[in-house]
């Protein structure tokens, strides 16, 4: 990114790579994750203040192990090698790396030797997080051994004159007691960064960039009302105003009042050009009689493409398509070390013959940064902090066929759940919460009469990133209020159940 201090992280396949980048940005210093294949010349052109070599799953002795351009070490730019990165640095400078009989994984206690630069003002003994197979058994000549541990005699090294540093542990992981302090020392004391990166100056720079790219031409954006597409629309509108047109497809599978809310915020408050497509009947017709969850997803995804294509083809002189691709999407799909390759299409995978130039202004930001950006742009909290919501909408929160009656039950019950969770002050504490209709009826008694009505399920989970989750311990009195309201205020419900399954073995969504 232009006009900002950059700390470059080279990716060698560690599961913690994104954490390194995140930690640096938390200091107010811009950081990017790039392939380990970058050449020294390419890095020189990027002009970073510092370079971090990440950890990785390989042994340096594996035939296909990842290596970097060794010219990096001669650029005069400070380098911090983490785990595998320290081993590469050691090999380059004639140190010795050996395979360990047993992989070291977990917490370890290190002891400092003297007062190393990166460990300034931290205790002599401290807990760190190890995750390695190989280890450095002889430090390179002219390098100091800064820390040791019982199982890793060389846990940290440095050559202060050359601004080269290495740690065998992972400072980016919270389990490392003084990891943030170590990274902070590297970024500010060694690299000389000032910490001038913020969402505010991101807005200024990105607005200027969009204006230069678009000129007097027009941009199309698929607006769902979700966090990413909403923030993209707000940012681009700030840059080019009426040159932006948004298409909002209401497929009838949204949450209560969601469609109206999107139109109020963006058409009325932001004064954007929005084309709202009421496609409810079209989608429900296609879903009639369909119970298989994967088939439901496929039908909805394909139909969205057709609807969007129909509307886009009516517009004249559109040159650009805006998408809410995030930095996590770029990392997952674009690095050489990615274990799982994903294709990210925020509008569901548009036809290949739609000849637009993509604009992805959020593709250097993480989710929490996007939320902060949205707040800075004036997007209301109720949208910025929206619950994660699947593309197929309420259709996959209904087990079995999607009907008007089933949608109404899920829509009303979900609204009550969200209202009560917010009243209890739990809406920022719980990662995701929603109701699901399992399509099960049971016998009950209401008003002295027998009933035979639907069961509604509540799903609420806590999580850091959605990859794993645990069921949320909602207080009993809150659950009682929710249950009472669901049974009394939603037609055709006489029983409420709470899902107490973690992920794994279950997924967060039921379908």
UniProtKB/Swiss-Prot annotation:
It is an enzyme of class 6 (ligase). It comes from Oceanobacillus iheyensis (strain DSM 14371 / CIP 107618 / JCM 11309 / KCTC 3954 / HTE831). The gene is guaA. Residues 197-386 form the GMPS ATP-PPase domain. This is GMP synthase [glutamine-hydrolyzing]. It comes from the Bacteria. GO terms for molecular function: ATP binding; GMP synthase activity. Its EC number is 6.3.5.2. ATP binds at residues 224-230. It holds the Pfam family GATase. Residues 6-196 form the Glutamine amidotransferase type-1 domain. The lineage of its organism: Bacteria, Bacillati, Bacillota, Bacilli, Bacillales. The keyword Ligase applies. GO terms for cellular component: cytosol. SUPFAM superfamilies: Adenine nucleotide alpha hydrolases-like, Class I glutamine amidotransferase-like, GMP synthetase C-terminal dimerisation domain. Pathway: Purine metabolism; GMP biosynthesis; GMP from XMP (L-Gln route): step 1/1. The active site is at residues 83, 170, 172. CDD domains: GATase1_GMP_Synthase, GMP_synthase_C.
